[in-house]
């Protein structure tokens, strides 16, 4: 997988003896302290509220990004009217209202128009006018002149309700009857709701900020006084799994040395070629194996220490290398680097899954606010790739129309200009200049021949050869998309190969997740400090 490295030039991977650390280095990625990735999946709840009574006319929840989570919402006109249109409040026989089946039925055929209150237009008045004090303030509705707008955030149209008011044979029936009151009436509905409305978000509505509720006024179009209903639309955004504090210090992770038991016990037996007596300095880690498609979650709220995470990374790398190329692991040194970059990406080609709803990988895996400083090779690119990064693309796709989620294959990520993510929202990609490259993520572990370390203890003054340093990523690149799926020619079964690779994936997942929690806590801490200083 050869190719240029972006955006930084390659560096000398050899280090002096005082910096050469075999396992005890802190693995970290370049971190962007900016906003979360636009591809982040949230639990988004939209609510339509009757502003007079404060009751909810509709509450719809869905999973999606802040760019594509805009559902079509259904509610009934009487849900935003309540008792405000009763005859005692308006006129004796108004021909509209929600207190009687006949009025609900007569109201079905009455046109209406809607005016926005968020626009703050003085000529349109306030809530007492339904924000419709003069003609021209209406932006949507169901009238003969079909009001429209190029800037308002929603459209409201009439829905369709099955059933009529007067049935065949002269009997009375239909959805305008409340089945709680008229249980014997055929076709009666819950609450007598027979004035369905459909609310949809416009392009402007999808692009605006919904930090607070926005209000509208709805008025019936009839002879005489046009009655008013007021409603608001609001959005609540929640993370799918709220973050939890780990340890006494909310900023720093638990900096513990490796536990003795984790260096002894293991549930995974590494594959050794015949005659392989073991590798110096490599021990196994206690790790449970789960399917690649199953999100890896910590067994308990207690995060493992930094030392254990680092050893897990080295041992996971060893297992993956040993099962694919056992001759390389007979006698070698695997070292974690002591300076950035600590992870690297290898661009690969792969078959992603295209789904209309967020798959589990988009919901459970961390939505990284992280940047990969070095990506090499050539692979699959999505979106509009600038010339500076086109060398990474062996195949480029513009994407898909509509709202879709592109989940990266197991063991891979999308490296986007907005961060590292397991899943792409096409709505975000189509509306922004975002672009992504499919990559394998590998820890920056270097591979050395045995004499690399021995020469440091050799006191004889002689000319030493510059040691050859290879990253394991270059040796294993393409394993997830090619090696495991097609076999790597070692005679081992794909299942065994997958098990070894899972341990490395678990180690990386744990390390990155711990990093994200530390970064989130650090952001909160810095915000708190700035408030104190100011």
UniProtKB/Swiss-Prot annotation:
Glycosylated residues (UniProt): 43, 58, 286, 322, 327, 351, 354, 430
Comp. bias (Polar residues): 258-274
Positions of region (Disordered): 245-279
Site positions for Cleavage: 465-466
Disulphide connectivity of cysteines: 115-132, 124-137
Keywords (A to Z) from UniProt: Cleavage on pair of basic residues, Coiled coil, Disulfide bond, Fusion of virus membrane with host cell membrane, Fusion of virus membrane with host membrane, Glycoprotein, Host cell membrane, Host membrane, Host-virus interaction, Membrane, Signal, Viral attachment to host cell, Viral envelope protein, Viral penetration into host cytoplasm, Virion, Virus entry into host cell
Topological domains, Extracellular: 35-534
GO biological process: fusion of virus membrane with host plasma membrane; symbiont entry into host cell; virion attachment to host cell
Entry GO CC: host cell plasma membrane; membrane; viral envelope; virion membrane
Modification after translation (UniProt): Specific enzymatic cleavages in vivo yield mature proteins. Envelope glycoproteins are synthesized as an inactive precursor that is N-glycosylated and processed likely by host cell furin or by a furin-like protease in the Golgi to yield the mature SU and TM proteins. The cleavage site between SU and TM requires the minimal sequence [KR]-X-[KR]-R.
Coiled-coil annotated spans: 496-534
Residue span of region Fusion peptide: 468-488
Quaternary context: The mature envelope protein (Env) consists of a trimer of SU-TM heterodimers attached by noncovalent interactions or by a labile interchain disulfide bond.
PANTHER family the UniProt entry points to: BC035947 PROTEIN-RELATED, VIRAL ENVELOPE PROTEIN
Known function: The surface protein (SU) attaches the virus to the host cell by binding to its receptor. This interaction triggers the refolding of the transmembrane protein (TM) and is thought to activate its fusogenic potential by unmasking its fusion peptide. Fusion occurs at the host cell plasma membrane.
Record-given protein name: Envelope glycoprotein
Gene: env
């Amino acid at each position: 997988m050869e190719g240029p490295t972006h955006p930084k030039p390659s560096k000398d991977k050899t280090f002096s003896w005082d910096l050469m650390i075999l396992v005890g280095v802190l693995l970290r990625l370049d971190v962007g302290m900016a906003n979360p990735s636009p591809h982040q999946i949230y639990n988004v709840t939209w609510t339509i509220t009757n502003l007079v009574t404060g009751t909810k006319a509709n509450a719809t929840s869905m999973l999606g990004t802040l760019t594509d989570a805009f559902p079509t919402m259904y509610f009934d006109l009487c849900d935003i009217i309540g008792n405000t249109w009763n005859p005692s409040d308006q006129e004796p026989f108004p021909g509209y209202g929600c207190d009687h089946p006949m009025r609900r039925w007569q109201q079905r055929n009455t046109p209406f128009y809607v005016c926005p209150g968020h626009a703050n237009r003085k000529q349109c008045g306030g809530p007492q006018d339904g924000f419709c004090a003069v003609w021209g303030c209406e932006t949507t509705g169901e009238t003969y002149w079909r009001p429209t707008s190029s800037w308002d955030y929603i459209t409201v149209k009439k829905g369709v309700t099955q059933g009529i008011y007067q049935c065949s044979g002269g009997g009375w029936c239909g959805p305008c009857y409340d089945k709680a009151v008229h249980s014997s009436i055929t076709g009666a509905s819950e609450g007598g709701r027979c004035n369905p409305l459909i609310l949809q978000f416009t392009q402007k509505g999808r692009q605006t900020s919904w930090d607070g509720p926005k209000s509208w006024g709805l008025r019936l179009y009839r002879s005489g006084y046009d009655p008013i209903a007021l409603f608001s639309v609001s959005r609540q955004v929640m993370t799918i799994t709220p973050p939890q504090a780990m340890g006494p210090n909310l900023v720093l992770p638990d900096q513990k040395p490796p536990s003795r038991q984790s260096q002894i016990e293991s549930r995974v037996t590494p594959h050794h070629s015949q005659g392989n007596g073991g590798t110096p300095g490599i021990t196994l880690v206690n790790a449970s194996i789960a399917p690649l498609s199953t999100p890896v979650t910590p067994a308990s709220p207690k995060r493992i220490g930094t030392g254990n995470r680092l050893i897990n990374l080295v041992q996971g790398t060893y297992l993956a290398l040993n099962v694919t190329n056992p001759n390389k692991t007979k006698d070698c040194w695997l070292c974690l680097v002591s300076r950035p970059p600590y992870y690297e990406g290898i661009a690969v080609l792969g078959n992603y899954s295209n789904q209309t709803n967020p798959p589990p990988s988009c919901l459970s895996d961390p939505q990284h606010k992280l940047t990969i400083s070095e990506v090499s090779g050539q692979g699959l690119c999505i979106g509009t790739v600038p010339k500076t990064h086109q060398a990474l693309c062996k195949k480029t796709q513009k994407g898909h129309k509509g709202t879709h989620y592109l989940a990266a294959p197991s063991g891979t990520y999308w490296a986007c200009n907005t961060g590292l993510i397991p899943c792409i929202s096409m709505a975000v990609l189509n509306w922004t200049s975002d672009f992504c490259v499919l990559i394998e993520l590998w820890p920056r572990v270097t591979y050395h021949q045995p004499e690399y370390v021995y020469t440091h203890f050799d006191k004889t003054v002689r000319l030493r050869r510059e040691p050859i340093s290879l990253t394991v990523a270059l040796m294993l690149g393409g394993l997830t998309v090619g090696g495991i799926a097609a076999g790597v020619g070692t005679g081992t079964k794909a299942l065994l190969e997958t098990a070894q690779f899972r341990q490395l994936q678990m180690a990386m997942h744990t390390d990155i997740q711990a990093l994200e929690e530390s970064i989130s806590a650090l952001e909160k801490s810095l915000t708190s400090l700035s408030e104190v200083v100011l």
